[in-house]
Amino acid sequence: MSSKKAINIIVATSTNYGIGYDNKMCWHIPEELKHFKRITTSCDDKKKRNCVIMGKNTWYSLPKRPLVDRINIIISSADYEKISCEVSDCKDNIKVFKNIEDAFAYVEENEEIESAFIIGGAQLYNECLDKYVYKIKYMYMTIVYDKKYECNKFVAADVIFNNFKFEKKDVYNSELKYITMKGYNKGISYPRDEPAD
């Protein structure tokens, strides 16, 4: 059964679907970061906020933490206590859970949250694609193709393209550096007149 709220994945990859090297992004494209912020902060209901869900390595890799104007959810079983103590003074904006199931339950129960975005890293992306693809409504995907990047963390592209439909109207090509695409989960029914983001 799919979620009542929109749970989405947003990911940027190289042309061979790498997402980073040793827990660091391999590119820095300000326009793409603005796209990420716009997608993850936009709410139809101005009284609500979105949340971003990430693993601990993604959390620690953020230059500025937490990501503003969003509830930040960190998933870590091994370092749950440590991270919980580190963020104890930001309980309104940061939540820590031991597993993704608890995070999904929190999203469903929290009336302040409009949509959720899974933002990495590779382990969390691939766990969600493997076990919870039926919950994922939209796939926001950026492919960076300005040059070849060396990556050692990858996302399961075969699962993405087998389960999400990307339409031409939802593809944007940005000055020969990257393309952004919005994919619709083939297993979820929803109005097709929704505007592209």
What is each residue range found by the language model?
Residues S2-D197:
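Enzymes that bind and transform nitrogen-containing heteroaromatic metabolites
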